[in-house]
A protein has these predicted regions:
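N-terminal regulatory/effector-sensing and dimerization cores
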Residues: 6-115, 147-153
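Basic/polar phosphate-binding segments, predominantly the helix-turn-helix DNA-binding elements
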Residues: 168-189, 197-248, 265-294
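Hydrophobic recognition helices of helix-based DNA-binding modules
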Residues: 101, 162-170, 230, 254
Length: 301
């Protein structure tokens, strides 16, 4: 369908990166490669399938249950190469929107009145997280509005709400560092960086037989130092986090694919459908067979 039929907030890669407005880049394809691009503050995800992003030599495979939050100026490459189509969904904020949300959060009311437009750049590290959290839910609300071809005014308000959730996510990232009990700030930052390496490695292959030892090796940390630090930073043990992420991936696969329950069971690292169904039912209150399965995706543009 021709591009002129897409809403004005849905843009093309080559004319959307000036940071002058909020835009969404989305499309379904089996093969795509975009090398060496950088954006304003942005969020990368997938509506279905998976998209590979590479940043500074690191690989992030983004599924429909994950998102990648990138700071202003991070240079990346994008690749889709699959037998079945994947739909990427990328949100590019206008320059200053997220920074203004941050300014409003950390600045005293008196200073906001005296200098309401004194907005500074917001520095943060790229962040990979589950789409079932607050930021992901705000992103899903925007994606639903875009799919429904909502009015530009409605979508603009959703961008503002999403920007506020981005700031909350950045705050949580900083609190994760603060919660670590190392004395030196540089040590806390390094521990957090290594924990993030491990989480990204696990996200890349949830079906692998992860043990504490293999998780710790991915973080280049001693096993029990890794376990203690992970619990301090994220508020849950590595085992509990892995169990939650596997169930979240299963839920999204049930909602977005035609895979059988058995295929999904194996895809997230379970070897028994009975055990998988019991764990799923305990977490969500319904068996996998009770989840509404998807209709074929409707491509609007």
């Amino acid at each position: 369908m021709a591009d002129r039929q897409a809403p004005p907030y849905v843009a093309r890669c080559e004319n959307s990166r000036g940071g002058t407005r909020n835009v969404v880049l989305t499309g379904a394809t089996s093969h795509c490669h975009v090398p060496n691009f950088s954006d304003p503050v942005s969020i990368k995800t997938a509506c279905y399938g998976e998209v590979e992003w590479r940043l500074e030599g690191r690989r992030y495979v983004i599924h429909a249950d994950t998102l990648l939050l990138l700071p202003d100026g991070d240079e990346y490459a994008l690749t889709i190469d699959s037998a079945t189509p994947s739909r990427g969904f990328n949100v590019l904020f206008r320059s200053g929107l997220v920074e203004d949300c941050w300014h409003a959060m950390i600045t005293k009311p008196e200073a906001l009145l005296d200098a309401p437009y004194d907005v500074q750049p917001l520095a943060f590290r790229r962040r990979l997280e589950s789409k079932l959290g607050p930021l992901g839910q705000a992103l899903e609300a925007l994606a639903a509005a875009v799919a429904a071809k909502a009015s530009p005014e409605c979508v603009d308000w959703l961008f503002e709400s999403l920007g506020a959730k981005v700031v909350e996510s950045v705050c949580e990232q900083r609190w994760e560092v603060v919660r670590l009990n190392a004395l030196r700030p540089a040590t806390r930052l390094e521990i957090h960086r290594r924990l993030e390496l491990a989480r990204a490695a696990i996200e890349d292959d949830l079906a692998a037989p992860w043990r504490l030892l293999t998780m710790a090796r991915a973080a280049m940390m001693a096993p029990h130092h890794f376990h203690r630090s992970f619990h301090q930073a994220y508020g849950e043990t590595p085992r509990a986090w892995l169990a939650r992420r596997r169930m979240e991936r299963a839920l999204i696969l049930l909602r977005t694919t035609k895979w059988s329950v058995t295929d999904i069971c194996f895809a997230i690292g379970y070897s028994s459908t009975t055990s998988f169904s019991a764990s799923f039912t305990t977490r969500y209150g319904t068996p996998p067979s009770g989840v509404v399965r998807p209709r074929p995706p409707v491509e609007l543009w």
